[in-house]
């Protein structure tokens, strides 16, 4: 069932947490209407700081607030957060292990018509390489709220990757997030599809297509990219013998890379990755772009069948 965009759930979660924790502060870089931090800003204007189009400075301010005992959520589009402010995230937040939550929206191809300059497809790779950084890609609104709640209680840097478009509901409303723990959305024993973000819903749909052909596909929501759920990956490799990863992100160093690192060291099995290749995005509708770059349930099902043949 189609639910809210993860960015909408983010705004709601901030407002709810702001009511119970006066140490939570929110920063934005002139995009609060889009990131939905304006929901928090209207409720708690004295705890909201718009730094303007100066993302690096925003991260520095967030680091200072964290050093003073606050719990800052620094928000902007993924391309500006992970891209423009990378040095400040690395040196001012991760190096001293400060309690800053970098919460970005408008990630991946589903930014749509804004085109390649705004379609961040490399941020998971960049962020999971940073020491002390936890990287999370929630699949839906319920999981987003659970992740924000967890992040507010956890001490340390966290990168939370959210999207622009509405997405299907996957997790139950009472879902509890734990880092390094995945969620099995569909059980199966012929092949495992490991996905994150909006691709989880597409993987679930692909599993339905495969079921019609008598193929039992397991679907794992791997929202915690770092730390990753090694146990679930190795269990899936042992029980299904084939792993397919799906992400709205480059296959170079993202979810697919993280899963491959686990498999090659501990349990090599046939594996394939679905995501963008060595390319930028382009302008177009979200649906058209997902179709062009192979990020559809139909393509996932096709790749799963090809992968099974390699077992």
Q: Where in the sequence are the language-model features?
A:
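Thiamine diphosphate
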Residues: 1-161, 166, ...
């Amino acid at each position: 069932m189609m639910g809210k965009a993860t960015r909408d759930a983010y705004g709601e979660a901030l407002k709810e947490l702001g009511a119970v924790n006066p140490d939570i502060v929110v920063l934005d870089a002139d995009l609060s209407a889009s990131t939905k931090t304006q929901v928090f800003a209207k409720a708690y204007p004295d705890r909201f700081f718009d730094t303007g189009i100066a993302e690096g400075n925003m991260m520095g301010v967030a680091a200072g607030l964290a050093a003073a005992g606050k719990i800052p959520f620094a928000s902007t589009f993924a391309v500006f957060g992970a891209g423009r402010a990378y040095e400040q995230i690395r040196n001012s937040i991760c190096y001293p292990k400060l309690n800053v939550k970098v919460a970005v929206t408008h990630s991946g191809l589903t930014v749509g018509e804004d085109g390649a300059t705004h379609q961040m497809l490399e941020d998971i790779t960049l962020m999971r390489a940073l020491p002390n950084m936890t990287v999370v890609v929630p699949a839906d609104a319920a999981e987003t709220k659970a992740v924000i709640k967890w992040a507010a209680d956890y001490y340390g840097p966290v990168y939370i990757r959210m999207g622009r478009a509405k997405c299907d509901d996957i997790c139950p409303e009472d879902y509890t997030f734990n880092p390094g723990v995945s969620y099995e959305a569909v059980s199966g024993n012929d092949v495992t599809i490991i996905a994150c973000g909006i691709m989880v819903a597409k993987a679930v749909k692909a599993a339905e297509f495969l079921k019609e052909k008598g193929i039992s596909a397991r679907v794992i929501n791997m929202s915690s990219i770092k730390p990753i759920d090694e146990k679930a990956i190795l269990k899936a490799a042992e029980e299904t013998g084939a792993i397919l990863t799906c992400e709205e992100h480059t296959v170079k160093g993202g979810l697919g890379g993280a899963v491959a690192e686990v498999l090659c060291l501990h349990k090599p099995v046939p594996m394939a990755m679905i995501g963008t290749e060595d390319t930028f995005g382009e302008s177009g509708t979200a649906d058209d772009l997902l179709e062009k770059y192979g990020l559809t349930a139909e393509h996932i099902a096709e790749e799963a069948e090809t992968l099974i043949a390699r077992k």
